[in-house]
């Protein structure tokens, strides 16, 4: 890539000089803003700023869904005035209180995640424009609405790479403004930090959308393809007889050069290339638009990074960016695995060999003279990684290098355990390692083996062990058979939901006859192991919900099989339809999940997308039954993704660790004034049921999460058939997993047709006896009782300005 340098030149003595100015920084955005102003139909918030959504939408959400703060500690250590004790409603030296400080802490996580995705998008956009040119069309499948998140924010509907640049500049500009508010002596009100966090969440989905649409277009990924190929997944899929290149991270740009080199030199069947985290998902999408037989494999999520390294299987490791462990170099160095850093965001202190000759770098790394290197030239990267893997494979195979102990070493380590319990205290998942070690001493290794799936591979246990027992290696030793059999299938990320699919399902979603969209996303910080998300997905799929998934969740769902040996991806269709399991793609593909909800409003309801976030979000909150699940959320990106869903009116359930994010958004269902909206036909207030009753909350167990999510798909606009279907699922799931009927089911009944058909008579009796409702038993109709009346033509909205009288 050419580098810009400063300098000057004179044209005084030159004749017939023509100067061409190719690009002025910021000019694209300015031109786009002027173009957006000319739109015939547009909402009030084209190119919004920090304040744009505050009063019209964000504060309305935050009034109903009040922030519940969960501080990690009572101190603020932000500046040299501190540390300040903020307990007991005290204020710090700068004047900030605990609410404001906690709001800032949550907000900081959100903008960090937003920046991560935006920087990912900027890197890909610049690289792909340099490689393919600005005119490369955004071919994303059979759709006209290509970039709903970009359109909502800017009014723009880009059709090629170059037209995306103004949206990218917009996100970057607003991120700078947002980051400035974190400085000491800036914002101090918790409610305004929450509003800014919601705005940042909306920007995050723009950044993610940019990241994914440019790579789908340039790298020939599947394009809204429900039949995208099935990809092998799991540690057991790796052929140990072949040299193995392991790639880790989220930015697939450099990996495509490695795959190209493999194909050009006929090496696809002579070595293995597989990945961890979202780079794995995206390398399995590369050139799969025509459904060619895939050869790249997926190992799994971040929780498997250290396990894979300790196994000794990789011959070379390449890292790019995001969710990459900080100890990969020292861990790999112990096992003679060279590490190559391919992105400037992670360089690990390694020597930079970007300008070096590839032959020389191969020799340096092969000899062990350096543990790894930085290589930012993608052409060289592709050659270096493949050649090095092919040479390191035989060398490491001959030495049989692995961190897994021998039987004798295993017995010695187990015998050393003093049963002090320090490992269990240090474990984020509180795994009972001492108990498992105790049984292992007696020859029963099943308890240790059970820990394999539950362990997130963080090695905190090892660092506190007084006996210096390599506990992770011990667990992996007894799980060798389990690891060898870890072979599943994951459908390659298919890309966005097509316009045709939205047209087919839009009415069902708004009326409620499709019970809802369940979005399983996020990280692998599971409290009880990866199978939780499999159980959740299976339950909702069997009940005809649409289950969409991305990232770690998409991978972990594919790890398990039923009694017939089939994964969920083999059992259920890949289309956006009732009972469909839709792997959208990697983390950045999450933008297509919110995009699908936005497209329901735009395509089915003909609402204007351009600069119209509040109206679109209002429509989704009142009409589109959807709920997200980030069961293992750990990262800042997870908080920004979830917050971007929240501003759109989409609730999200997080796992038990997620109280550490410091903030939830939970409504008080007993405050009836909070559960009123306007009828857009006449501007009159109308009561609605308390649904969804949260925008962001946590659950302790997957059994608790399932009925919570089913309930969160209830919407005010459900027709009677839809409400009956949703109540049936919610009540059955509540009974199945929590052992009793929900206490507040009656609040969602508007007339007898809303009741679950199979239990209608019994529920009518309960309404009469427990709640005093009047029932006509001859006609089996409700005469009086419900506070909410059903009106199929009602137009619920939270925005007074959308009412006809306004």
UniProtKB/Swiss-Prot annotation:
Name the positions where CO binds: 117
- Where is [4Fe-4S] cluster 4 bound in this sequence? 427, 455, 458, 461
Recorded metabolic or biological pathway in which this protein acts: One-carbon metabolism; methanogenesis from acetate
Entry EC number(s): 1.2.7.4
Query: What are its GO biological-process terms?
Result: acetyl-CoA metabolic process; methanogenesis, from acetate; nitric oxide catabolic process; response to hydrogen peroxide
What remark does the entry make about the cofactor? Binds 7 [4Fe-4S] clusters per heterotetramer. Binds 2 [Ni-4Fe-4S] clusters per heterotetramer.
Which cofactors does the annotated protein need, by name?
[4Fe-4S] cluster; [Ni-4Fe-4S] cluster
Q: Superkingdom of the source? A: Archaea
- The residues that hold [4Fe-4S] cluster 1 are 73, 77
**Where, in this chain's numbering, is [4Fe-4S] cluster 3 bound?**
417, 420, 423, 465
InterPro entries, alphabetized: 4Fe4S_Fe-S-bd, 4Fe4S_Fe_S_CS, CdhA, HCP/CODH, Prismane-like_a/b-sand, Prismane-like_sf
Keyword field contains Amino-acid biosynthesis:
no
| PROSITE patterns on file | 4FE4S_FER_1, 4FE4S_FER_2
Annotated [4Fe-4S] cluster 2 binding lies at 76, 79, 84, 94
Which residues of the sequence carry a binding annotation for [Ni-4Fe-4S] cluster?
250, 278, 323, 523, 552, 587
Residue stretches making up the 4Fe-4S ferredoxin-type domain: 407-436, 446-475
Domain remarks: Cluster B is an all-cysteinyl-liganded 4Fe-4S cluster; cluster C is a mixed Ni-Fe-S cluster which is the active site of CO oxidation. Cluster D is also an all-cysteinyl-liganded 4Fe-4S cluster that bridges the two subunits of the CODH dimer. Contains two additional 4Fe-4S clusters, dubbed E and F, that probably transport electrons from ferredoxin to the B cluster.
Its subunit composition reads:
Heterotetramer of two alpha and two epsilon subunits. The ACDS complex is made up of alpha, epsilon, beta, gamma and delta subunits with a probable stoichiometry of (alpha(2)epsilon(2))(4)-beta(8)-(gamma(1)delta(1))(8).
Which purpose does this protein serve, as stated in its record? Part of the ACDS complex that catalyzes the reversible cleavage of acetyl-CoA, allowing growth on acetate as sole source of carbon and energy. The alpha-epsilon subcomponent functions as a carbon monoxide dehydrogenase.
- State the name under which the record lists this protein: Acetyl-CoA decarbonylase/synthase complex subunit alpha 1
Q: Which organism is it from?
A: Methanosarcina acetivorans (strain ATCC 35395 / DSM 2834 / JCM 12185 / C2A)
**Phylogenetic lineage:** Archaea, Methanobacteriati, Methanobacteriota, Stenosarchaea group, Methanomicrobia
